[in-house]
Amino acid sequence: MLFPNGNKNDGGNMSKVKLQTAAEIGTLIRTKRREQHVSQAVLAGLASVGTRFISDLENGKGTIQIQKLLDVLNALGLGLYIFNRWEKD
């Protein structure tokens, strides 16, 4: 799968992906959830959030709560990396 910013989903071996929009975050969450064969309801339970939150997140809603996003990422075995975009990788 190709993300809107040109990143490719590498079948689960991804180490870093640069995401710039809520829609890209949602696409990544949906892709990873499906790769793990987890329903939205199960993921919501694992992350202690509602299924509506998972749906909103996967659909790119831009006003989600950061802690809930972190909880969902953690439930999927993912994390968030912040970097200075003006420095070289």
Predicted regions and their residues:
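N-terminal flexible/basic segments that precede or flank functional cores
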Residues: 1-24, 79, 84-89
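Short, contiguous strand/loop micro-motifs
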Residues: 16-17, 27, 56-57
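Short basic helix-loop element that most often maps to the first helix and adjoining turn
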Residues: 27-42, 46, 71
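Recognition helix of helix-turn-helix/homeodomain-like DNA-binding domains
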Residues: 48-62
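DNA major-groove recognition helix of helix-turn-helix/homeodomain DNA-binding modules
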Residues: 67-83
